[in-house]
Amino acid sequence: MSILSRVSDRRPDLSLVSEEDFPYEQDIVRNPGSTKPWLAYIEYKLQKGTVQEQAYIMERACVQLPRSYKLWKMYLRFRTKHVSKLNAAIFASEYQKVNSLFERALILLNKMPRIWEMYLKFLMQQPLVTHTRRTFDRALRALPITQHNRIWALYRPFANSAEGETAVKIWRRYMQVHPEDAEDFIELLVAVGLYTEAVHKYIEILNNPRFTSKNSKGHYELWSEMVDLLVEHATAVETGHETGIDVERIIRSGIERFADQRGKLWCGLATYWIRRGSFERARDVFEEGITTVMTVRDFTLVFDSYTEFEESIISALMEMASTRAEKGEVDEVADFDLDIRMMRFEHLMDRRPFLLNDVLLRQNPNNVTEWEKRVALWGDNKEEVVKTYLDAIEAIQPKKAVGALHQLWTNYAKFYEAGGDLSSARRIMEKAVKVPYKSVAELADMWIEWAEMELRNECFDEAMKVMAKAVQAPKRSTVDYFDETLSPQQRVHKSWKLWSFYVDLVESVSSLDETRKVYERIFELRIATPQTVVNYANLLEEHKYFEESFKIYERGLDLFSYPVAFELWNLYLTKAVDRKISIERLRDLFEQAVEDCPPKFAKVIYLMYGNLEEERGLARHAMRIYERATRAVADEDRADMFNFYITKSASNFGLPSTRPIYERAIAALPDAEARDMCLKFADMEKRLGEIDRARAIYGHASQFCDPRTNPGFWTKWDQFEVQHGNEDTYKEMLRIKRSVQAQYNTDVNFIASQALARSQQKRMEEEAAGNGGGEMDAEVADAMAQLERQARAPVGFVAASEGPKGGSMPVQPVEVHNPDAIDLDEMDE
């Protein structure tokens, strides 16, 4: 270290130059202004020389060529590396020598940022805060502004490590050139307790529309951080005209702007005043908050904070009162203040349901349900109840009402009715029926409520007058009930609900003639419903006006078409048949009923018609009607109709009479139903002993029955031939069976249906036996392969007997059982 000291003294030390160095020394002498020989000399010494020799050569080089950046950089790096392992506090003198070396270099190289960076990094290793800060400032002054970022990259960490006032001053300078890092500066200001300046910085960046947070914070988030700072350090932040900080104004501006954060901001403003000791102002803020917030969430937040604030004050006052009691002191003013605060707190808790209701009504003053709840909250307080009803009526816009507005008016009138003031209730009802409700139905309900009120008070004449006024309309009204451009008052006279109540009222308290007039008026206005027709007809029937009753049904049938007309015809025909009017007239009615009747509804009417002919007419006429019915009914009812027709024909004219019916049924019905009909037909012929006819029917039905999917049919035919046939007929049956099977095998659709039937049958058998699914899949695959082989086989001559021909093995068809098949033998038994 002493040698390095001598080197720094710039005195030549020839002992550090050896004979081997002469070539380099001579080269230096020959080229005194060039750095190349010096660099070669230094390179040589770095490989062969000692540390002292290396330092000596570098020192000489920098003295001879003081403007060489390369030589100085090499020398400075060499010296800083040499002392870097030493403790800067203990070896401060050694560090100071290197500092002096940097100062020498900067005399001529003060525009070199790399030299400054090396010097500043070296200084930051030493406990020289002031000197380091001044050196940073010198670097900023010496270098052009385009290179300041390199210095600030070191200056900022130094400032943060220095902390305190030093850091703040450095950051203030940094903010002048890099305002985008304001958030970091604010963190520093908060950390050192300069809250007022931090708030000013927040205000500055919030007022700058070009500011973009490097932490991706939005405008609200920054503003919220500022508010939290103001509230948390309420006493430390300087406010007033001098500082330009008005906390209440700032927070209130946020309450107006950020609607979804009002509860939090009201609590924040109140907390601010609490921390500043202004309890009354805090209470005023809480009161304003709970009476202005728009959501239940915000209300709950503010109200809970309010109650917590009051409880804390009361708790503190009670502790003080307890302390006074222990000491035996009496302070009437303090005790009175405690009593007042407790009463105020109880009043606040009592107000909670009303305040909550206010919140919901502020959200939507047209909410009828909430107004009803408010009325219920007042209970027996009649003055407040009336005031609430008046406020509701004034606040609610009828066209925007949510809920049953007419019910609010009704309850208002009932309030006076319950108090015995019927005249006031009537005045309310008179006003209520003039309100432009959203729908005619509400107005109709209002009129009905008025009439019911009169009925409850046994004022029947008044009720009649009310309803007569409600349905009052021009003689020939052309108003469209569904025309929304007209007011409900202009359309209410066509309200079916209103007329229905009116007719019930007239029917119960007035004469038949008056009731008929009301019904006739309903028909004139063309608002009658099927129920109106039925009620009117029943009324006349009860009073023995049977023919008039029938006329009403006919008028109803003129008004309504099917399907409504079906119900009216059903009632009308039933009443007419029960009345036992002339058979000719009944026939005319039934003919009218079935004339335009859709197939869907024809079955019932035809059955009634046929039953009439059976009971009061001729059986032959009934059969003709049933025959017509088989053509008129819907497809899904046709098979049932044929079966009914066959049953009636057999009971009236014997089994042979059913043959043409069976034949027409087989021709008219689809294949599946025709097959069942053939089986019944064949069974009937068998019972009559017509074996050949039965066999012919089986032969005809065979074309509908694939042996693989309909084995039940072939089983029955087989049993039939066994019982009644011979070898020839049995062979013929087998021939037909093979022929049909071959026919179906050529149809891809039938092949698919056969495979499906087989798979379903196998699945059912395996489920019954508890077998696994693997065997079922194998058998289904085998069945499908067999079907494919049969489908590919050529269709040729069909032999009359079964058996192996030409050495080929017969294919045994897999028998499929139909779980839905009907055993006709059991049915016959």
Curated annotation (Swiss-Prot):
Record's protein name: Pre-mRNA-splicing factor syf1
Subunit structure: Associated with the spliceosome.
HAT repeat feature ranges: 15-47, 49-81, 93-125, 127-161, 163-182, 277-312, 380-418, 420-456, 473-505, 544-578, 581-615, 689-723
Family: Belongs to the crooked-neck family.
Entry's Gene Ontology BP terms: generation of catalytic spliceosome for first transesterification step; mRNA splicing, via spliceosome
Chain spans, region Disordered: 799-829
One Gene Ontology cellular component: U2-type catalytic step 2 spliceosome
Role summary: Involved in pre-mRNA splicing and cell cycle progression.
Principal subcellular localization: nucleus
Keyword entries, A-Z: mRNA processing, mRNA splicing, Nucleus, Repeat, Spliceosome
InterPro entries in UniProt: HAT, HAT_Syf1-like_N, HAT_Syf1_central, HAT_Syf1_CNRKL1_C, Syf1-like, TPR-like_helical_dom_sf
Key word Ribonucleoprotein present: no
UniProt keyword Repeat, yes or no: yes
Localization per Swiss-Prot or TrEMBL: Nucleus
